[in-house]
Amino acid sequence: MTNIRKTHPLIKIINNSFIDLPTPSNISAWWNFGSLLGICLILQILTGLFLAMHYTSDTTTAFSSVAHICRDVNYGWIIRYMHANGASMFFICLFLHVGRGLYYGSYMFYETWNIGIILLFTVMATAFMGYVLPWGQMSFWGATVITNLLSAIPYIGTNLVEWIWGGFSVDKATLTRFFAFHFILPFAIAALATIHLLFLHETGSNNPSGIPSDSDKIPFHPYYTIKDIMGTMFLILMLMALALFSPDLLGDPDNYTPANPLNTPPHIKPEWYFLFAYAILRSIPNKLGGVLALILSILVLVIIPLLHTSKQRSMMFRPLSQCLFWLLVADLLTLTWIGGQPVEHPFIIIGQLASILYFVILLILMPTISIIENNLLKW
């Protein structure tokens, strides 16, 4: 008799996705981040659920309810800090996952890649709205500044901003709707992640060499289940180290001051994982231009597959492209640093140069270097 895991309508879906899935035999630890993102999402939904049981989305009580969670709820402090730092771990995994896709040419799976970009936008929106909920100074002013960017849209901008606010400023209506969206979006992310996986399993995974691996596949379980468990252990170790030893390391001290519309903090800045985009936004002295650059800094990923001019899929055997890739990584780290600095000399010019370099590398240098490498292959 055939095993139930291969015949049962529900179990066979799990079997074909996580047990008997034919997987390339040579995928490295860089392929762990997909499963780690799944773990992050589950952790965030669970901790978020328990936080939502005690949180109140009202301007008068939101800040106090978060303090109440940390002080009075059993293990509320660890749930709150796991949720806050879990977001940071989520973005670390996201950036490494996207970086892996760029390096090894995984973007050639168009559907998987494009759904991944939609996922990235959705996670960023969710994280932004979550940051508003504690209703500290940085929550309030961050929400004010970022939602105000929509006013740069010609003709409908101002109406759009007031529609999102639910009034003439960030207030009770804004907080309530942000809480509602912050609660529902992770489930949309889970659905999108399932579709992401569905499209990936249509083609099978890429591998470091970028060469089709149909002739050399191994079952996902036990080889990669054990590898993923090891990755998960590292993830949880890092998360717990962060949440238990330095929970406020990545946060902003201003957010321990209750929101005050009459007092603007000296430096308004988002969480660290948005700083690179924030630096690109600030580097353009025009409001609409800055907003467009901000959106394009992520949306540029959509055209990466169209700009793939190399004869090889992966960068594994392309040293010039590798140099360019690591220059891009250094550039993004520079942008992240600049995003957290005040708007003054020399940070302004560094930010502008780093922003230009970011787009030049992705849109001009990468395709050009790939063509040069193709010609070098003929020698």
Swiss-Prot record:
It holds the Pfam family Cytochrom_B_C. It is a multi-pass membrane protein. A ubiquinone binds at H201. Heme b b562 binds at H83, H182. Keywords: Electron transport, Heme, Iron, Membrane, Metal-binding, Mitochondrion, Mitochondrion inner membrane, Respiratory chain, Transmembrane, Transmembrane helix, Transport, Ubiquinone. Its main location: mitochondrion. GO terms for biological process: mitochondrial electron transport, ubiquinol to cytochrome c. The chain crosses the membrane at residues 33-53, 77-98, 113-133, 178-198, 226-246, 288-308, 320-340, 347-367. One of its GO terms (cellular component) is mitochondrial inner membrane. GO terms for molecular function: metal ion binding; ubiquinol-cytochrome-c reductase activity. PANTHER family: CYTOCHROME B (PTHR19271:SF16). Heme 1 (or BL or b562) is low-potential and absorbs at about 562 nm, and heme 2 (or BH or b566) is high-potential and absorbs at about 566 nm. Component of the ubiquinol-cytochrome c reductase complex (complex III or cytochrome b-c1 complex) that is part of the mitochondrial respiratory chain. The b-c1 complex mediates electron transfer from ubiquinol to cytochrome c. Contributes to the generation of a proton gradient across the mitochondrial membrane that is then used for ATP synthesis. This is Cytochrome b.
